[in-house]
Each structure stands twice: as C-alpha cells, then as structure tokens.
Amino acid sequence: RGIISSYQAFGLNILLAAPTGRAAKRMTEATGLEARTIHRLLEAKPPEGYQKNEENPLEGDVLIVDECSMIDIVLMNALLRAIPPHMRLVLVGDIDQLPSVGAGNVLRDLMDSCVCKVVRLTKIFRQAQSSRIIMNAHRINEGLMPDLSNGKTTDFFFTEKEDPEEAVAEIVNLVQTKLSRYYQTPSSQIQV
C-alpha cells in the first residue's frame, strides 16, 4: 500500500497483477484496487497468444506484480513484451517460496543478475515474529539446523516415525488436537 500511495501522490495510473486468481484476489483485498491475473491483464486469447504485446502495449504508468516467484520464463517474456518503455515495473515476491511450475526461476535470476534494483524486506508481518515456523525457516535459509524441540504453545512440531501407519496417526493427532488448539480453529478448517 505504501508503494501504491507514493505513486498515487504523483497522479500515476497503476496496474496490479498476479500470476493466479487467488493471488490477484488477495492483492485486491489488501490494496483496495483491482488486481488482475497476468493472463487477464495481457488479454490471453488461446491459441493466438496475448492481445497485449509490443504492438498493443499495456496502458498505464506503473505495473506492480505480486507473487513473482510463481512466474515462469514464458509468461514473464509475454509480460515484458507488453510493457511500454515509459512504464515502471515493480516485481514483488519471495524467492524462498516454491518456484514456478513452468521453466525458469525468473525472480531469483533477476535478483541474482544485479541488473535491477532489489529491496529485501526482513520484517515479517503475516505471522507473529515469535512463530517457530518462521524462525526455523530463517535458520534453514542461513544454513543452520532448525530448532526441533516441541512444546505445548508452539506452531512448529517435529516428530519421527518409521512406520507409515504411525506417521498417519501422528498427522491426524496433530491436525485434530495440537494445531486445532494452537490456532483455535476447527480441525475441519485445517489443510494438510
């Protein structure tokens, strides 16, 4: 919202996009502005391709694209071809999330290339900073062993089971009791 507000202060026309419908919906909810899928933004018309391209570029001053780690090389190529020279492009994403299903790891490659300005955010807002899931994810990224200890008031659980049936029983117990209690959510609302 801060980036959007800054551009709006200069009267710039902002486009918002994301690779999936779910991500676009979250972006709309978070910003109060309409976000579209990249395919919809580019006016995909299979099998011909995209209506928005070099000859018929996007209209606007700024394009902000969220969840960029999910964008493969083919879709990013189509997107970049549709951006006119004057348009500013802001790519938002987490390179530590799963990469795109299609070919390429575009966001990571762009960040590693050093050809564009990169800003890394280090403060976590989605979950409490006391989250052991987040803490252990950071430890793993730093090449450290995660804290595998268990407790009653934690969002991180580690268990080892050799027998597949015991593993299934432990997962069921985890969902029905531990996670349900920790998140104060019915087990029917927890996805595994």
Could you describe each region identified by the protein language model?
Residues N13-V62:
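Inter-Walker segment of RecA-like/P-loop motor cores
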Residues L42, I71-D72, L98-P99:
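Catalytic P-loop NTPase motifs of RecA-like helicase/translocase cores
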Residues P47-D61, D72, L80-M87, S187:
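Short basic/glycine-enriched coil/helix segment immediately N-terminal to the Walker B
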Residues I95-V192:
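Conserved helicase motor core of P-loop NTPases
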Residues D66-E67, G93:
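Walker B catalytic acidic pair
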Residues R1-E29, A35, V90-V92, D155-A167, ...:
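Conserved RecA-like ASCE P-loop NTPase motor core of nucleic-acid helicases/translocases
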Residues G11-L12, G60, P85-R88, C114-V119, ...:
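Short glycine-/polar-rich loops that comprise or flank the Walker A/P-loop
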